[in-house]
Curated annotation (Swiss-Prot):
It is found in: Cytoplasm. Its EC number is 4.2.3.46. This is Alpha-farnesene synthase. Mg(2+) 3 binds at E462. It comes from Cucumis melo (Muskmelon).
Length: 560
């Protein structure tokens, strides 16, 4: 831990903490994208893309019953390749019919294992609370049923990711498939391509991976599959490249926006992570029609990240009380009560919210969304202040106290209301916004998963620089346990909360009629942090896998 000296209003000098955050690994790299020449429409490619799209639609709309396994494989491939947003109507129709057939048929137990697991996964992913009883017949005879068939084992493994609490057969399936796949990887006779595919699945199961990252990996893999659909690879490559150009244009704009505000220079104690912030937004929604949503989300993530660093690292407790009060009042006249660095931040915060409100003024629910975003920001200030008080006093809260705060302090409510604002008033009705701000169970499960994953990978670094106790310290002190044992327990809890995510996704779609598009943003938010915190704190220390992910989506081009 290091310190530096900064002036405060009464001219006394105060020694401040510093986390010595790494500089941005990107610097001004994406500002150069502003100078790129606009892409001229390639009419030949556009025509070819449209023809391929129509060809895929025809195959989805074919009605031959004997083709069901092939059609399910086609849907799975479309989803893995990240182009399912083009075929939502067709896929919804097919899976709705399939669900009806599945729950009324008495012969599903005779299915081939691959077909059964694929059908189960596709239906659960869609939000159908399909029974897992069909897996019961394999209990005690997994090896004889699957016999080291890699494709079947991968299908079983991916299906088991969508298990709920109490589904013991799927718990068994997960353990069996994982062990078998790990053995295949260790076998020196296994084809290297197969090893790569299995390793990818073991680290990044489809349900817990970001769709765009999944697509960037799977496009090359799918092209080599002997059973591939001939139209899909080219269509997926063209679509990926087209979207990438849009995303590059957006990151250039947002980089300039950040540069114009001068946050990196004026608030140099904070993390300069505007590129990573855009990657977060891209993870939550990548579709072309949600461009404005990504830009709004990135601005909120950026301004929220600085707020976190003020409370977490730089501000004195007395200054933080002033800032919390200023947030509650939400008025520029409050700036005169704040120290210089806070004044700059507070004015920028209010300006960003006003800027977003003006950008979205055409949307019917904008005033209500903006109001709820402000309320969520005020709430963040209050819980950040509680954490600052705990840190100042050296207090280790109980696990229950910690989780009550953690549900709020990760910012899920603010992020999700921002997502709804960007998605538009057709989806973001006042009723849906109220549902999100009530912190429904699916959002609570997501917040706990993200908080625990963050604590597991970052608690040592944070404790070294002086930080509020994490879940690890809370568990250790309350239960007199070793760090090793606590990490095992928290890992198991994360698995259980993923099961809650699956169950609540299905329940909310069927019983509360929340649009699938809204729930998908909650799921993508959880996937995002699963990716970011998989190998460490990929936001604070973004030079490793996070940089690789960003490069694959925003820098590297696919050969067409």
């Amino acid at each position: 831990m290091s310190s530096n000296i900064s002036a405060i209003p009464n001219s006394l000098e105060v020694i401040r903490r510093s986390a010595q955050f790494q500089a941005s690994v990107w610097g001004d790299y994406f500002l150069s994208y502003h100078s790129l020449s606009p892409e001229k429409g390639n009419k030949v490619m556009e025509k070819q893309t449209e023809e391929l799209k129509e060809e895929i639609k025809r195959e989805l709309n074919s009605t031959t019953k004997d083709e069901e396994p092939e059609k399910l494989r086609l849907i799975d491939s479309i989803q893995r390749l990240g182009v399912c947003y083009h075929f939502e109507y067709e896929i919804n129709k097919i899976l709705e019919q399939l669900h009806h057939i599945t729950i009324t048929s008495k012969n599903n137990g005779d299915d081939h294992p691959y077909n059964m697991t694929l059908r189960f996964r596709l239906l659960r992913q869609q939000g159908y609370n399909i029974s897992s009883k069909s897996f019961e017949r394999f209990r005690g005879k997994w090896e004889s049923s699957y016999d080291k068939n890699v494709e079947e084992l991968l299908s079983l493994y991916e299906a088991s990711q969508l298990r709920m609490r109490g589904e013991e057969a799927l718990d068994e399936a997960f353990r069996f498939a994982t062990a078998q796949l790990e053995a295949i990887v260790q076998d020196p006779t296994t084809d290297p391509t197969v090893v790569g595919e299995v390793c990818q699945a073991l680290k990044w199961p489809m349900y817990k991976n970001l769709p765009r990252l999944q697509a960037s990996h799977y496009i090359g893999l799918y092209s080599e599959k002997p059973w591939r659909n001939e139209s899909l690879p080219n269509f997926a490559k063209m679509d990926f490249s087209k979207l990438q150009k849009l995303h590059q244009k957006e990151i250039a704009y947002i980089s300039k926006w950040w540069d114009d505000y001068g946050f990196a220079e004026k608030l140099s104690f904070a993390r300069n992570r505007i590129v990573e912030g855009y990657f977060f937004a891209l993870g939550i929604f990548f579709e072309p029609q949600l461009s404005t949503a990504r830009l709004i989300m990135t601005k909120i993530i950026a301004i929220g990240s600085v707020l976190d660093d003020i409370y977490d690292v730089y501000g004195t407790f007395e200054e933080l009380k002033l800032l919390t009060l200023a947030l509650e009042r939400w008025d520029k006249s409050e700036t005169k009560k704040l120290p210089k660095y806070m004044k700059m931040y507070y004015e920028a915060l209010l300006d960003v919210f006003e800027e977003i409100e003006q950008e979205m003024s055409q949307k019917e629910t904008t005033p209500y969304c903006i109001h709820q975003m402000k309320e969520a920001t005020k709430e963040l200030g209050r819980v950040f202040l509680v954490e600052a008080k705990w840190c100042k006093e050296g207090y280790t809260p109980t696990v229950e106290e910690y989780l009550d705060i953690a549900l709020i302090s990760f910012g899920h409510k603010l992020l999700m209301v921002t997502a709804l604002l960007g998605m538009g008033s057709t989806i973001a009705t006042q009723q849906i916004v109220q549902w999100i701000t009530s912190m429904p169970n699916i959002l609570k499960a997501s917040a706990i998963i993200c908080r625990l994953m963050n604590d597991i990978v970052s608690h040592k670094f944070e404790q070294e620089r002086g930080h509020v106790a994490s879940a690890i310290e809370c568990y250790m002190e309350q239960n007199y346990m070793s760090e090793h044992d606590v990490l095992i327990i928290l890992g198991k809890q994360i698995d259980e909360f993923w099961k809650d995510m699956v169950e609540n996704y299905c329940v909310v779609i069927t019983e509360e009629e929340v649009p699938r598009g809204v729930l998908m943003r909650v799921l993508n938010l959880t996937r995002l942090f699963n990716v970011i915190y998989k190998d460490g704190d990929g936001y604070t220390q973004s030079h490793g896998s996070t940089k690789t992910h960003i490069k694959s989506l925003l820098v590297d081009s696919l050969p067409l």
